[in-house]
Amino acid sequence: TVLVRSGAADAAVAGATRSTADVLRAGLKVLGVAPGVEVVSSCFLMVLADGRPVAYGDCGVVPDPDVSQLATIASSTADTWTGLAGPVSGGGSPRVAMLSFSTKGSAEHPRVDKVRAATALVADRRPDLTVDGELQFDAAMVPSVAAVKAPGSPVAGAADVFVFPDLDSGNIAYKVTERLGGARAYGPLLQGLDG
């Protein structure tokens, strides 16, 4: 992190012998939080079995984000995807799916309301991003499911960035995708540090 702070490096690789929490503490102490970023979070770059890169956020830092934090996680993860996977995916803006156990009103619950509110906040803060929610994972990922559950969505069935509503779901999802789905997982990639 000292080399990143001094400008001698663009990024740092850490964590082989330390926990994510230790790496995060060092990053915060040396780099601090980037201006305009509300919360430091993480994402995993997942290279699926078919070779397609997607990003999962947050899978390692914020246990139960509030609406504003969830919106920040979505923006940060979209920016990380754009910087790392966008060039190998043909460029363009990522399609950001705000995930829930509900798709477009299929369920009502305060947790669904949180995802809806965060989706609206991302759209307001970042009109340059293509974002939609609330979406179940299958509606965000599978075109045939999207056609039934979320017709007309600019994201459903074609998401590049998957934003999970809490750390439980994000952490479990990346491990299931890696272990059962045969994906390669790269991360956690810390995002929101000033460096």
Predicted features along the sequence, with ranges:
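Anion-binding alpha/beta catalytic cores of soluble intermediary-metabolism enzymes, centered on
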Residues: 1-156, 160-195
